[in-house]
């Protein structure tokens, strides 16, 4: 269970007095509440933002908490509160971030601070019980010897609409997000995601990762949206494939999405019709509603998702057949057209088995026993298609194999229950009368497609050319880690924004070369801002200050020199020796922090972790799927070779407990082949 931090807050009346009120939809847009400088990066911008926040009176000790009042609506007044908690990592019992290790950032140095951005579900609950959130984001799963079944989300994050954490160096994680379907009273998931994206952009966050386990009902959104749009739901905000899971690399992931999304409906529907009449009818229904040709499974799912978003209470699916009488080519009376339409329906009702698709010629031959006028019959057959006749909807489609029109009946109650209850189609008017498709009905159709085509495909979709479907679905579902690089468009601005002759400050990209430290002590480049007249010596000491304040492992770092600049040049101005915006390497050493005689402290310091994924003994991951490091999925450790591998790859189902004694396949074979000794 992840350790939690609880922040006690003051009373609502005391906290709200004199606070600023910010517009939710505009918060952290350019210039609101401030213009954030790109040069200093996240570490400087977050301090600027917190200067506009309210410092919570109930917080004591080293942990600090600020809050912002965000106004959703003015009439009626609706306000939510965003909290920002500054966590001192040195004082934390869990310094390492498991999410960094799972996304592949295990080599990142541990920062001195982490900032948690929290949007509680209900402010009143946070005031009464305190602000509770996880400080160790293991979330279950991963390289642990535990025997728990499957993986779980962090329980303390479920109580928040938003929980994001950003390390002081600008790398962060979106831990939790819940919209209206996840318990929010006022704010949708899109609005919360927009807010988080604006905060990250404004504060010049570098890269943000997330684990996508979002669902809509029983449907995995990363699969549903992946097939429909070629990307996850978070893709509209720029989140892309982050790292392999179960050995699924980026090319395989992209190919799986392409295979599923481009599956032709003209090939898929005939195979489905052999096992289920409902699926072809669903496809035909939305093909008729769309008004344009839906060629692939991706086209169909994308249309259904977009239709759901804009579906009014009285959307359309079918039309009263009497509307065909207004067509210019109709030269028959209403009574004769009505008789012909009912004859067609009777012919379809007598089809065996029920609800099967019947060719146009079969319907025509059966109806001719009652309608002698072949011209009238041909007109009705040509015009009927997704029209309501009595208590039935006449569906029509073209068989992609035979190229012949086929007809089928669907009970009108599946389109509009009120029509069936009221005894058929209303009698008023002879123009086209449209009937509604509710969102609940569309969702039922969507779940039906998802279940029988993607999640639990029938036998028709597990062999031959369709055998790739289950494999592609598994690969798409295996990828859960996604990242967004906010630093792409900011690097150029940071290097060129300010600096050079005529500017009061210069910005330099600096990193460190630690001469006596571990190879792990290799921090990323940071922007160091100096006065335009600063000397090389001042550059050296400023770089020392920035890096020692940012990383725990560099607190004792002492700068010796600037690589490429002689020791006799330290008193010279930086401008002229170093180009503005260029990369600068400062060389130095990490001071001794332990007493050589204190053996106990020495062992403790040697075991202390300086990186997010180090310390406590390096784990060796060697899985049959090709994984070589911890990807956050449930793993087990071999009791002989001590190599970790996925429990799923070892044949242990997610619903099963891991065995107390576990042997990998290689060690198991070695034990079996070991010669026996007879005493």
From Swiss-Prot:
PROSITE patterns in alphabetical order: UPF0054, ZF_PHD_1
Q: Which Gene3D superfamilies match?
A: Zinc/RING finger domain, C3HC4 (zinc finger)
> Which controlled-vocabulary keywords does the entry list?
Developmental protein, Metal-binding, Transcription, Transcription regulation, Zinc, Zinc-finger
GO molecular function (one) = zinc ion binding
Gene Ontology, cellular component aspect: nucleus
One biological process term in Gene Ontology: pollen development
Question: What CDD domains does the record tag this protein with?
Answer: PHD_MMD1_like
Q: Which InterPro entries match?
A: YbeY_CS, Zinc_finger_PHD-type_CS, Znf_FYVE_PHD, Znf_PHD, Znf_PHD-finger, Znf_RING/FYVE/PHD
Q: Which stretches are zinc fingers (PHD-type)? A: 620-670
Instruction: Explain the purpose of this protein.
Output: Probable transcriptional activator required for tapetal programmed cell death (PCD) and degeneration, and pollen development in anthers.
Its recorded name reads: PHD finger protein PERSISTENT TAPETAL CELL 1
Q: What is the protein's species of origin?
A: Oryza sativa subsp. japonica (Rice)
């Amino acid at each position: 269970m992840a350790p939690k931090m609880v922040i006690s807050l003051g009373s609502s009346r005391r906290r709200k007095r004199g606070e600023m009120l910010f517009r939710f939809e505009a918060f952290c847009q350019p210039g609101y509440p401030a213009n954030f400088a790109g040069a200093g990066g996240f570490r400087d911008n977050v301090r600027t933002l917190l200067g506009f926040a309210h410092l919570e009176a109930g917080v004591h000790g080293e942990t600090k908490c600020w809050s912002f009042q965000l106004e959703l609506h003015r009439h009626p007044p609706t306000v939510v509160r965003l909290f920002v908690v500054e966590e001192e990592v040195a004082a934390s019992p869990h310094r390492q971030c498991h999410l960094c290790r799972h996304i592949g950032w295990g080599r990142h140095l541990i920062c001195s601070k982490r900032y948690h951005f929290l949007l509680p579900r209900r402010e009143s609950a946070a005031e009464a019980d305190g602000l509770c959130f996880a400080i160790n984001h293991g979330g279950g799963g991963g390289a642990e010897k535990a025997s728990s079944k499957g993986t779980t989300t962090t329980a303390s994050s479920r109580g928040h609409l938003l929980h994001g954490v950003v390390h002081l160096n600008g790398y962060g994680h979106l831990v939790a997000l819940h919209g209206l379907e996840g318990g929010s009273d006022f704010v949708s998931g899109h609005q919360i995601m927009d807010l988080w994206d604006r905060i990250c952009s404004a504060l010049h966050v570098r890269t943000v990762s997330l684990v996508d386990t979002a669902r809509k009902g029983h449907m995995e959104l990363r699969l549903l949206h992946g097939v429909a749009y070629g990307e996850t739901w978070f893709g509209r905000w720029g989140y892309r494939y982050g790292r392999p899971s179960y050995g699924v690399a980026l090319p395989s992931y992209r190919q799986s999405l392409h295979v599923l999304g481009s599956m032709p409906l003209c090939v898929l529907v005939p195979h489905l019709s052999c096992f289920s009449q409902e699926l072809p009818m669903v496809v035909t229904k939305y093909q008729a509603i769309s008004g344009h040709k839906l060629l692939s499974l991706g086209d169909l799912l994308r249309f259904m998702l977009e239709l759901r978003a804009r579906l009014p209470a009285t959307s359309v699916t079918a039309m009263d057949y009497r509307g065909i009488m207004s067509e210019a080519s109709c030269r028959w009376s209403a009574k004769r057209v009505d008789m012909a339409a009912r004859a067609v329906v009777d012919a379809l009702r007598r089809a065996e088995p029920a609800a099967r698709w019947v060719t146009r010629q079969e319907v025509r031959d059966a109806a001719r026993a009652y309608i002698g006028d072949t011209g009238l019959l041909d007109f009705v057959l040509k015009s009927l298609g997704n029209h309501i006749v009595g208590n039935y909807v006449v569906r029509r489609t073209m068989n992609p194999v035979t190229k012949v029109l086929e007809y089928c009946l669907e009970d009108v109650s599946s389109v509009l229950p009120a029509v069936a209850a009221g005894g058929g189609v209303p009698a008023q008017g002879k123009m086209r009368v449209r009937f509604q498709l509710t969102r609940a009905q569309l969702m039922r159709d969507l779940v039906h497609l998802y279940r029988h085509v993607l999640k639990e495909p029938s036998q028709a979709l597990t062999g031959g050319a369709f055998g790739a479907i289950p494999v592609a679905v598994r690969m798409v579902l295996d990828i859960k880690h996604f990242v967004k690089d906010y630093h792409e468009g900011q690097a150029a601005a940071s290097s060129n924004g300010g600096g050079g002759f005529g500017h009061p400050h210069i910005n330099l990209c600096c990193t460190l070369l630690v001469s006596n430290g571990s190879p792990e002590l290799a921090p990323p480049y940071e922007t160091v801002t100096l006065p335009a007249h600063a000397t090389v010596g001042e550059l050296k000491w400023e770089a020392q200050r920035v890096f020692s304040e940012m990383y725990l492992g560099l607190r004792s770092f002492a700068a010796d020199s600037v690589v490429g600049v002689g020791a006799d040049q330290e008193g010279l101005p930086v401008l002229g020796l170093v180009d503005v915006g260029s990369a600068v390497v400062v060389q130095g050493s990490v001071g001794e922090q332990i007493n050589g005689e204190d053996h106990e402290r020495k062992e403790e310091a040697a075991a202390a972790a300086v990186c997010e994924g180090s310390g406590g003994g390096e784990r060796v991951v060697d899985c049959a799927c090709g994984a070589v490091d911890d990807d956050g999925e449930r793993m087990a450790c071999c009791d002989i070779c001590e190599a970790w591998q996925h429990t799923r790859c070892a044949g242990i189902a997610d619903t099963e407990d891991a065995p107390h004694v576990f042997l990998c396949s290689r060690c198991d074979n070695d034990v079996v082949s070991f010669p026996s000794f007879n005493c």
